[in-house]
């Protein structure tokens, strides 16, 4: 079982270890040096695939394919709890992830990159917490505040990485996560726009929630692959267009993630890491993770 010390005031530099969660094209182990596979079992079952541990520029990193390396796990069936638990268990302090999404805004064009800052959860079948009352879960009930939803400092690292590489990126967006695997109806797509959604995908929730509950600093790079189906007079989203646009832009995301790893490693994150853990402790009743 994982444990977090709720009153740890030791602010000596804490070594960072960065988890990278990717989809198709972003689970390439060649970005890691000195790589080794590690198979992990968790109290919540098996992760999507083996963890691949290694280094990027001398920085300890762990790669995990969200949908498995064969991309044979649909979004509803991803074991998000096992994925996050496994990455936390091997010592990750940060998670930087990629996600394909549809655009709900004219100005976010297919092929554009976006750093989401908030979410709307429309999933229906997914476990949202480690504190589920089972014999192997942490004790208590965690009422986790989800503002801010993402680690602002990690988000800013990703934004600065894109700027240094001269890769245009939208710096804010609210992402709607639907259950899938189907795409939205037109009425749903229009409704999400009215709600303030800018992007739509199938994986951010509960991944971002569980990462925060595990005390990890989470940031995401989203690739807009299509306009969903809200635009009148236009064909809706289809898988072939999604895959084509994703493949055309995946190298840009890889460059941003690699650059961000180096930037994260240059800074002292001790206070952020301890504050993230303290947030969990402060909002857990009758126990701590």
From Swiss-Prot:
SUPFAM superfamilies found in the cross-reference section: Purine and uridine phosphorylases
Q: Which UniProt keywords apply?
A: Cytoplasm, Glycosyltransferase, Nucleus, Purine salvage, Transferase
What domain of life is recorded for the organism? Eukaryota
Q: Which reaction does it catalyse?
A: S-methyl-5'-thioadenosine + phosphate = 5-(methylsulfanyl)-alpha-D-ribose 1-phosphate + adenine
- Site positions (Important for substrate specificity) are 184, 239
**Localisation:** Cytoplasm; Nucleus
Does the record's keyword annotation contain Electron transport?
no
CC per GO annotation: cytosol; nucleus
Binding positions for substrate per the UniProt entry: 202, 226-228
Q: What Pfam families does the entry give?
A: PNP_UDP_1 (PF01048)
Q: Which E.C. number(s) belong to this protein?
A: 2.4.2.28
Give an example GO biological process.
purine ribonucleoside salvage
Q: Which GO terms describe its molecular function?
A: S-methyl-5-thioadenosine phosphorylase activity
Coiled-coil region(s): none
At which positions is phosphate bound?
24, 66-67, 99-100, 203
Q: Which family does it belong to?
A: Belongs to the PNP/MTAP phosphorylase family. MTAP subfamily.
What is this protein for, i.e. what is its function? Answer: Catalyzes the reversible phosphorylation of S-methyl-5'-thioadenosine (MTA) to adenine and 5-methylthioribose-1-phosphate. Involved in the breakdown of MTA, a major by-product of polyamine biosynthesis. Responsible for the first step in the methionine salvage pathway after MTA has been generated from S-adenosylmethionine. Has broad substrate specificity with 6-aminopurine nucleosides as preferred substrates.
Instruction: Give the NCBIfam families listed for this entry.
Output: MTAP
Oligomeric and partner information: Homotrimer.
- Matching HAMAP family: MTAP
- By what name is this protein known? S-methyl-5'-thioadenosine phosphorylase
Species:
Drosophila pseudoobscura pseudoobscura (Fruit fly)
